[in-house]
Amino acid sequence: MIRLTAVLFQATRRWWYEWTAVLPLALVWFVCQLLVLPGPPATAVLYALMRQSSDNQWWNGRDAWQAAKTLFWPAWKWALVNGLVVGLVVFNLLAYWDVPGAVWTLLRVVWLLVLTIWLGLNLVYWPFWLAQTDKSLRNTYANCGRFLLLNPLSGLGVTAVSALVLFVSIFTILPFVLGSMAWVALVGVTAVQHSLLTRDT
């Protein structure tokens, strides 16, 4: 099992060390989300470059562009699945949020749990996709699921902390808002690396 504190400490240390490089990258990522079409590929590229940073490998704009071309269609496949699942869960939560009754309360709890697990899977989706040979959606999500099964508390802990950081960053200064997504990517990358090292030892 991975150690939550070790993952967060290592990711935060790397994020701080790479701050000057991360900020322009995060700004480009933010703009891409506003433009929609390049949004999912930009997220995949962010993970890919943070993986290189975690491995002490330098990267530049050419690396980012090459990654964007490689990851464009895989990223959109991932985004479409995400949109379907998250849309379904959010619709059910909003549509039945005020419906009274114990059964409906239980269903809302189930939907919230499903959403949390799904976010946990996607936190580590790209680190697994980048690390494995079989890059299909099915195989990647299977590996993400195994990760959460093998590290249930740490996995949910990493997910909760990442979600909290993103939420808090929305109400803080712009540089932290931009840099927080890079930090989340580093957390996902670091968690997967720790998991793979634990498996191999």
Over which residues does each language-model region extend?
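Hydrophobic alpha-helical membrane segments
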Residues: 1-201
